[in-house]
Amino acid sequence: MESYLLDWANLLLRWLHVITAIAWVGSSFYFVFLDSSLTPPEDEDLKRQGVNGELWAVHGGGFYHPVKFNVAPPRLPGHLHWFYWESYSTWLSGFALLSVTYLWNARAYLVHPADPLMHPHMAIVAALAFLVVFWLLYDGICRVFGQRPRGDAIVGALVAVLVGLAAWLACRLFPGQAAFLLMGAMLATAMSANVFFWIIPGQRKVVKALQNGQPVDPVHGQRGKQRSVHNTYFTLPVLFAMLSNHYAWLYSHAHNWLVLVLMMLAGAAIRQFFVLRHGYKLGRRPHPWPYALAGVAVLIGVLAWLRPVSPSAVSASMPGAAVAPALPAVAVEGGAAGYAQLAPLLQQHCVICHGAALQQKGVRLDSPQQVQAHAAQIYQQVVQLRKMPFGNPGVLSDADRALVQRWYETGAQVAP
C-alpha cells in the first residue's frame, strides 16, 4: 500500500510541478521578450508620464499595448498584479517531488552500491547541501561583483565556472541519474531564491516608496533585472537536467559531468540566440546566429561523442558511470550464455517486481517473449548501470551480471 500511495504522490506532484513550471517559464520568457522588444513611445503624453518603452501586439483577436516606465509610474493603480507564485509553486512542488522520490529512497537513488562509506542519511544531507551552498556562493558572487564595471560579464564567467565545478562534484558523489537531477534542482533553487530574496523584495520597496511619496531608488530595479536575466539563462539547462533522467546513456557515461556541462552550455547559448533575436528584428543588434550555431555545434559534438560503439567498448566505458569509487568492470569471459542459464536469475531477483502480480514501469519479465522484448533494458539496468534489482543491487554478483552481458551480446536468444 505504501508503494501505491507513493506512486500516486509522485504522479500528482509531477503533474503539479509541470503545470506550475509551464506558468513560471511562460511568464518569464514573455517578460524577457517584452523587455527586448520595447520601442520608445510615440505618444508625447506617455513620454511625460515617464514611459521609456512600449509594445503593440495582437493575440487571440485582441490588441494589446503594454508600456514600461523608466523607474516607476507617477501613481499606482488600485490593483497591481504580482508575478511570484508561479516561482514559489514550482519550487515547492519540485522539492516535494524530490523528497518523495530521491530523498525518501535515498539508498536506492542517492547512494551508489559500490560506495560503502556513503550512508543514506549522509547522502540526503549532501543533496540538500548542494541546493543551499550553491545559492550562497552564487548570491555572494552577485553581491560582490554584480554592481562593478563589466559586472554582468564577471558574474557570468564566475557562475559558469561554479556550475562546472558543481557538476563535477555531483557526479563524483552521487550516481549519474541523481547527479543530473540535483544539478537541475540546484539551479532551480537559485532561480526561485532570486525571486524570493531579491526580485520581489525590491519591487515591494519600490511600491512602498511610491505609496509614501518618497523617491524611488533605481538600484532595486537594476538588481531585480540582473537576477531575472540570470534566471532566463538557467531555464534551458534546468529543463535539460530534469529530462535527462529518461536517457541513461547521458548520465551513465564515464565523463557524465562533462556531458552535463556541455548540454547546459548548449542550452544557454540557444537561449541567448532567442533573447538577442528580438533586438535584431528591431534593427538594434546584429543577427545572433553565432549563438545558435555554437549551441547546435555543441549538441552535434556531444551526439558524435556519445555515439554507440561496439559492445566491448560500451562495457569498458560505462559500468563506472564516473562515480566514486568506480565500479569493478564486469568480466565477460565464459562464452555464450543461453536463456536456460538466465531464467533462474530472473525468477529469483526480477519477477517479484516484474511479474503477473506487479509490473513496475510497465515491464513484465515472466515469459521468454517478454524477456526478449526488454533485452536492451535488462542489459542497460543490470550491466551498464548496475541499478537492478532495485533497492538491493548488491545481491547480484559480478558473475551474475557477466552472465546477463554474455546473453545479451550473443543475441539475447530465448529459444531452447
Residue ranges of each PLM-predicted region?
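Cytosolic juxtamembrane amphipathic/interface segments immediately preceding
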Residues: 5, 65-83, 217-221
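Hydrophobic alpha-helical membrane-embedded segments
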Residues: 15-44, 186-202
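Membrane-interface amphipathic/juxtamembrane segments adjacent to transmembrane helices
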Residues: 28-72
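Aromatic- and Gly/Pro-enriched helix-to-coil junctions and flexible linker segments
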Residues: 61, 75, 95, 102, ...
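Alpha-helical transmembrane segments and their membrane-interface junctions
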Residues: 87-107, 166-181, 234-253
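Long, contiguous internal "core" modules enriched in hydrophobic/ aromatic residues
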Residues: 103-220
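Alpha-helical transmembrane segments
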Residues: 132-140, 198, 266-276, 300-307
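Membrane-interfacial entry segments at the cytosolic side of transmembrane helices
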Residues: 148-157, 252-256, 280-296
